[in-house]
Amino acid sequence: MATRSPGVVISDDEPGYDLDLFCIPNHYAEDLERVFIPHGLIMDRTERLARDVMKEMGGHHIVALCVLKGGYKFFADLLDYIKALNRNSDRSIPMTVDFIRLKSYCNDQSTGDIKVIGGDDLSTLTGKNVLIVEDIIDTGKTMQTLLSLVRQYNPKMVKVASLLVKRTPRSVGYKPDFVGFEIPDKFVVGYALDYNEYFRDLNHVCVISETGKAKYKA
């Protein structure tokens, strides 16, 4: 049986790609330094993560819990791949979705003050296999707080899938179960990751420029 695939490690000296090689909205042309992870690579990696999730969690009802807002694109694409596996397998399992919204960033810094500002009744998680889907793990404090909250409802199992994990000295050491990409300590935007609500409409994961930070600063 194949083991879980490790995250794709992007080195600290990875230069990324010139913006001119990709389709970038004109209104962001001066606000980005480089394309860091192209959309096609994100999709291919997400497809493999779906297989890993089904292998580890596919024996019981799964509740997929999306962390809004940044996680919604990764969540939607990951679930599409999981549903395809469900349709084309001899063994399929029921899956439901739920949503929670957290707030921990101001400008480009994680504040460490985690606020739950939205979410449904999490009592539906009791006895279920819960897959928390997040866009990025930075310090890890937000996810540790959310895991403590979810475990109060006695789920059968809790696993975390994060598209990105940042290598940063601010990390508390938390690592998710399923990792798309491990990235350097850069502030990235796109593919629903935002800077003060901007850049969610980019398909690629990009590095924001100092011009972009200044323009959209809260």
Swiss-Prot record:
Biological process (GO) annotations? adenine metabolic process; AMP salvage; central nervous system neuron development; cerebral cortex neuron differentiation; dendrite morphogenesis; dopamine metabolic process; dopaminergic neuron differentiation; GMP catabolic process
Q: Provide the protein's localization.
A: Cytoplasm
What result follows from mutating residue 45 to K? In LNS; RJK 2163
What GO cellular component is one of the record's annotations? extracellular exosome
A Pfam family the protein falls into:
Pribosyltran
Q: What is the effect of changing residue 23 to F?
A: In HRH; Reduces enzymatic activity
List the cysteine pairs that form cystine. Answer: none
Q: How is the cofactor bound?
A: Binds 2 magnesium ions per subunit. The magnesium ions are essentially bound to the substrate and have few direct interactions with the protein.
Domain of life according to the entry? Eukaryota
Q: CDD domains given for it? A: PRTases_typeI
Result when mutating residue 143 to K: In LNS; RJK 1210
Which reaction(s) are listed as its catalytic activity?
A: IMP + diphosphate = hypoxanthine + 5-phospho-alpha-D-ribose 1-diphosphate; GMP + diphosphate = guanine + 5-phospho-alpha-D-ribose 1-diphosphate
Mutagenesis / variant outcome for changing residue 104 to R: In HRH; Munich
Q: What is the effect of changing residue 177 to Y?
A: In LNS; RJK 2185
Classify the main location. Answer: cytoplasm
Task: Report the enzyme's class at the first EC level.
Answer: transferase
Impact when changing residue 131 to S: In LNS; RJK 1784
Family, per entry = Belongs to the purine/pyrimidine phosphoribosyltransferase family.
Q: What is this protein called?
A: Hypoxanthine-guanine phosphoribosyltransferase
Its source organism is: Homo sapiens (Human)
Q: What are the leading ranks of the lineage?
A: Eukaryota, Metazoa, Chordata, Craniata, Vertebrata
Quote the gene name from the UniProt entry. Answer: HPRT1
